[in-house]
């Protein structure tokens, strides 16, 4: 299994973001509270 990506790291499959980060259209993990 892959480690969860931190802020501004990739979330290209099969990588996933650490909560509460979300994957944006550029496939980067971002904090939704800060906007996209």
From Swiss-Prot:
Cellular localisation: Secreted
Expression tissues: Expressed by the venom gland.
Keywords: Calcium channel impairing toxin, Disulfide bond, Ion channel impairing toxin, Ryanodine-sensitive calcium-release channel impairing toxin, Secreted, Toxin
Transmembrane annotation, as ranges: none
Effect of residue 16 to A: No effect in insecticidal activity
Cellular component GO terms, alphabetical: extracellular region
GO molecular function: calcium channel regulator activity; toxin activity
Keyword Transmembrane helix appears in the UniProt entry: no
Cystine residue pairs: 11-23, 17-29
Function comment: Affects the activity of both ryanodine-sensitive calcium-release channels RyR1 and RyR2 with high potency. At lower concentrations the toxin increases full openings of the RyRs, and at higher concentrations it inhibits full openings and induce openings to subconductance levels and reduces the number of full conductance openings. The different actions may be attributed to the toxins binding at different sites on the RyRs, with binding at a high-affinity site mediating the increase in full openings and the induction of subconductance states evoked upon binding to a lower-affinity site.
Note: This toxin may reach its physiological target by traversing membranes, which may be by slow permeation. Alternatively, scorpion venoms are known to contain amphipathic helical peptides that form pores in the cell membrane, and it is possible that these pores would allow this toxin to enter the cell.
Protein name: Insecticidal toxin LaIT1
């Amino acid at each position: 299994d892959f480690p969860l990506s931190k802020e501004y790291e990739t979330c290209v499959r099969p990588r996933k973001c650490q909560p509460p980060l979300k994957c944006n259209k550029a496939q980067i993990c971002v904090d939704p509270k800060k906007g996209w």
